[in-house]
Amino acid sequence: MVANIRETELSDFERVIGLLRQLWPDKELNRNSLLKIFSTCIRSPDNIYLCAEIDGHVIGFCSLVVRENLRVEGLVAHIDELIIDEPHRRMGFGAELLEAASAAAKKKGCKIVELDSAFYRQDAHKFYSKKGFEKKAYLFSKDLRS
């Protein structure tokens, strides 16, 4: 079975929120805040939001941010979220969505597509390595909300 990969629409929001709950099970999601960000990002030329669907049902989501980068002397696409619905994992849909995301980034003129992944997501790390991604750096983060 092959997924239909398409640009995300505002009407996909509720399903995407359900997928994000799987990606971040310990995070309390603020629906109103996320809706505002989601609706802005799907219209921005600096973002690529893709959904994977089977029989009209969204089973996957990927978001990328495109930006200029001095290191690569051009555009870089960063994958912020990539999630496949739990019952549909290990069926090739993640690979399809990742390939579509890479193709969309290339079409926008990006030289590199990159992502970060939590240390505990060992299966995801193996998946990304198999798909040609190389471990290049650690991500350091500082919370500025307090």
Summary of predicted features, one role per range:
Residues V2-V16:
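A short beta-loop-alpha structural element at the N-terminal edge
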Residues I17-S39:
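Conserved GNAT-fold acetyl-CoA-binding loop/helix
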Residues C41-C51, H78:
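A short helix-loop-beta-strand connector motif used in the catalytic cores of GNAT acetyltransferases and
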Residues C51, H57-V66, I83:
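Conserved beta-strand in the GNAT
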Residues E68-I79, R89, K136:
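A conserved beta-turn-beta hairpin within the catalytic core of GNAT-like acetyltransferases
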Residues I84, R90-A103, K130:
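Conserved acetyl-CoA-binding loop-helix of GNAT-fold acetyltransferases
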Residues A95, F119-A137:
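Conserved active-site alpha-helix within GNAT-family acetyltransferase domains
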Residues A105-D116:
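Conserved GNAT acetyl-CoA-binding A-motif
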